[in-house]
Amino acid sequence: MIRHSTSTQVAAPLGAYLQVTKPGIIMGNLIAVVGGFLLAARGEVDAVLMLATLVGLSLVVASGCAINNYIDRDIDAKMQRTCRRATVTGAIPLKQVLGLGIALGVLGFGLLAWFTNLAALLFAAFGYLVYVGLYSLYMKRNSVYGTLVGSLSGAVPPVVGYCAVTGRMDGAALILLAMFSLWQMPHSYAIAIFRFKDYEAANIPVLPVAQGVEKAKLHIVFYIALFALVSTLLPLAGYTGVGFMAVSCVTSFWWLLMALKGYRSDVNLLRWSRQVFGFSILTIAILSLTMALDFQVAGQAPLLAMLG
């Protein structure tokens, strides 16, 4: 007779609950939050505020992911990548998934409300409502512009980190919002290309499925080029230094070259889209780290003024 230890019995459901919150997405967002927070802190870090911001926003993101899993259970069942999720297999009762999402949201927003400020709280709420309400409930299923709308919510974490320190929306916060929104587009389109059959099976109108892979290639190149230009605004406006400018130009240029390879006649579409996707993650992680380290202290002239 096979015996199962108590630890094994507990680990399985705990693992299922953890997967519902999409820990990979949480970790990716944490890197962006740290970048925005340290950019604003300019070397004067409030450890308690930073910890509260990271934990609070992580809980908010986890809440959004759990509720997204609850909403998407019907389309997840049609996709090979997602058909084994707990909301599809029944590993966790749907009421518990919804309850978990609500509880995490209450805790996350509570922490942000108590420790941060109104600007950070409002941006977190904006991102949450766009992701759960507008994107998950409607745009993802019904519009080719779902990716564009969803990109706004994906760009919120670094802005929340920044505003947690400054308490206001300023030029740097706007640049971060634009920069991370633009990054989301080629990142998401690349996923949609190498997961084309999944999205097609679930009847999700992402650009490659709705309007063709060739148009998606064009959009990938366009958004990477625009992302590269917007990224230079941080050093040009004096929020970061020459180091960030150099790293931004190198990574963006390499990413753009990689995207242009999609037009080669002998391109392996699956491999190419995975490369564009993989380098997108590396790019945003490197830039988040660089902005955290290459901030400009008060009183230093903007790079644009130095060039002039």
UniProtKB/Swiss-Prot annotation:
Among InterPro entries, the record links this protein to:
Protohaem_IX_farnesylTrfase (IPR006369), UbiA_prenyltransferase (IPR000537), UbiA_prenylTrfase_CS (IPR030470), UbiA_sf (IPR044878)
- Associated pathway: Porphyrin-containing compound metabolism; heme O biosynthesis; heme O from protoheme: step 1/1
Q: What does the protein in this record do?
A: Converts heme B (protoheme IX) to heme O by substitution of the vinyl group on carbon 2 of heme B porphyrin ring with a hydroxyethyl farnesyl side group.
Name the keywords, alphabetized.
Cell inner membrane, Cell membrane, Heme biosynthesis, Membrane, Transferase, Transmembrane, Transmembrane helix
Q: Where in the cell is it found?
A: Cell inner membrane
- Give the transmembrane region(s): 20-40, 47-67, 92-114, 118-137, 144-164, 174-194, 218-238, 240-260, 275-295
**GO MF terms held by the record:** protoheme IX farnesyltransferase activity
PANTHER family associated with the record: PROTOHEME IX FARNESYLTRANSFERASE, MITOCHONDRIAL
Q: What else is known?
A: Carbon 2 of the heme B porphyrin ring is defined according to the Fischer nomenclature.
- UniProt protein name: Protoheme IX farnesyltransferase 2
Which catalytic reaction applies to this protein?
heme b + (2E,6E)-farnesyl diphosphate + H2O = Fe(II)-heme o + diphosphate
Q: Name one GO biological process term.
A: heme O biosynthetic process
Q: Which HAMAP family match?
A: CyoE_CtaB
Family per record:
Belongs to the UbiA prenyltransferase family. Protoheme IX farnesyltransferase subfamily.
Q: How does it sit in the membrane?
A: Multi-pass membrane protein
The main enzyme category here is: transferase
Identify the gene encoding this protein: cyoE2
Enzyme nomenclature, EC number: 2.5.1.141
Gene3D superfamilies, alphabetically? Answer: UbiA prenyltransferase
